[in-house]
């Protein structure tokens, strides 16, 4: 489970894959990973999920069911390439507005290029900022989404508290993330796929194996479904629930600001 802890020298440590690193060091390491894979990020997700991430993202949008009006505002965090935000805008019949926030400029650059090509720029705002210190006043958004990004945040509890702060009363949090497999046979297959196949395919596709190795390890260090639900509740959210997909390979967590 990802959690900050005190190191032998009194500093705060967290997990970077299977390594323990200083809390302040993790963000730079994660940024380097995503600078390397930004232009092939969607291919990376295809490799890591055998294409299933597209189905899971569709399930997130179905759960969100964005309102079809111009006043509906969504904050999509760690959403640099725009994949979730584009789906939200289309599901709202191009009426909603999405703010895409990412700490990585390379990822945002890809998203902005894609938005222009899709003709969605008027519905989108791109912001380079940290999920742990959102540059928005309280009670601004109707929904907060984050897909396959929360496990890369050094202080997940802080990010969840920030999500709660910027949501309006009645606003909804939706977190899609790789999670703990619930089926023993699938678990063994998934381990083999993750640790042996994914880094190899990653190197073939992008020339880089290390980013994929980190991402695989980071999944194993992320809290399981129940523990992450407890973290969301601790941040102040109500009616917290989760839905497993593909035997628990991924899970969608939901919470409300009441």
Curated annotation (Swiss-Prot):
Keyword terms, alphabetized: Menaquinone biosynthesis, Methyltransferase, S-adenosyl-L-methionine, Transferase, Ubiquinone biosynthesis
Iron-sulfur as UniProt keyword: no
Lineage: superkingdom: Bacteria
Catalysis: reaction(s): a 2-demethylmenaquinol + S-adenosyl-L-methionine = a menaquinol + S-adenosyl-L-homocysteine + H(+); a 2-methoxy-6-(all-trans-polyprenyl)benzene-1,4-diol + S-adenosyl-L-methionine = a 5-methoxy-2-methyl-3-(all-trans-polyprenyl)benzene-1,4-diol + S-adenosyl-L-homocysteine + H(+)
Coiled-coil intervals: none
GO molecular function annotations of the record: 2-methoxy-6-polyprenyl-1,4-benzoquinol methyltransferase activity; demethylmenaquinone methyltransferase activity
Pathway participation: Quinol/quinone metabolism; menaquinone biosynthesis; menaquinol from 1,4-dihydroxy-2-naphthoate: step 2/2; Cofactor biosynthesis; ubiquinone biosynthesis
Enzyme Commission numbers on file: 2.1.1.163, 2.1.1.201
GO biological process: aerobic respiration; menaquinone biosynthetic process; methylation
Residues at which S-adenosyl-L-methionine binds: 81, 102, 130-131
Major enzyme class: transferase
Family: Belongs to the class I-like SAM-binding methyltransferase superfamily. MenG/UbiE family.
Function: Methyltransferase required for the conversion of demethylmenaquinol (DMKH2) to menaquinol (MKH2) and the conversion of 2-polyprenyl-6-methoxy-1,4-benzoquinol (DDMQH2) to 2-polyprenyl-3-methyl-6-methoxy-1,4-benzoquinol (DMQH2).
Protein name: Ubiquinone/menaquinone biosynthesis C-methyltransferase UbiE
Organism in which the protein naturally occurs: Allorhizobium ampelinum (strain ATCC BAA-846 / DSM 112012 / S4)
